[in-house]
Amino acid sequence: MSAQNTQTGGDKSRRWYSMLKLACLSAGFFLTIASYTVVRELKDSVFMAIIGKEYVPWAKIVSLFILIPAILLYTRLVDVLRRSHLLYFYTIIYGLMGFGFAYFLGHSSIGLPNTDTGPYRLFGWLFYFFIDAFDPFVVCVYWAFANSISSPKEAKNTYGIMIAFSKLGGVASGIMAMLFLSRVIKIPWLVYGDVVNHQFLLVAASFIILSVPLVIQFMMRVVPGYLLHGYEAVYRAEKRRARDVSS
């Protein structure tokens, strides 16, 4: 009888932690897509204001070549970092860089206040490439992390919910940005203007993406380890990598 009660309690505990894991993964993806939705809308507007709309096709072409060394760096990091640490790395880097770009958007000569457009303005190109790489190096890294801690059966049962939350994140951040720009949502101390609007939205998106590693770290600490590995090959590789780092 006691063995049966123990098994029942174990099943309830497993279900609880599985639900907590799903909630954390869904919340993290909600925040990731919420941030991406905001910055994606800033990419072309900032580039056209600084460089010029006629150079947008060139930016798309050059971006493909810029991604090559970034992908090579990613493949190297995959070999030395665990999937969770890789996610922390990219979300923190993007959050901090977002603050830096937000600051320089208001710079009198580098940023938006300078209305002289031209291809020689390096900041506009850097901003475009920075936002363009968000999808492959943040969104895709998040999926890689989720895959590494989810079995195929679990993925089949839970990924639909995660995607639904990501859609909600995109819709919610888009609506909030629209309400802010239309002055429905007003911040008393903020001096409104095109430059400040861009800066505020980028700072908000940066704060959102920086909250993702906090959610994932909470999940990694609370959810038992036996629920945090999926594909066995990936799990064994992660264990070997952890031993190599500790030694």
Give the location of each predicted region.
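A generic, lipid-embedded transmembrane alpha helix
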Residues: 32, 66-67, 93-104
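Transmembrane alpha-helix boundary/hinge residues in polytopic small-molecule transporters
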Residues: 42, 73, 138-141
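Small/hydrophobic positions within alpha-helical transmembrane segments
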Residues: 31, 62, 66, 130, ...
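Pair of pore-lining "gating" transmembrane helices in MFS-fold secondary transporters
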Residues: 15-46, 126-130
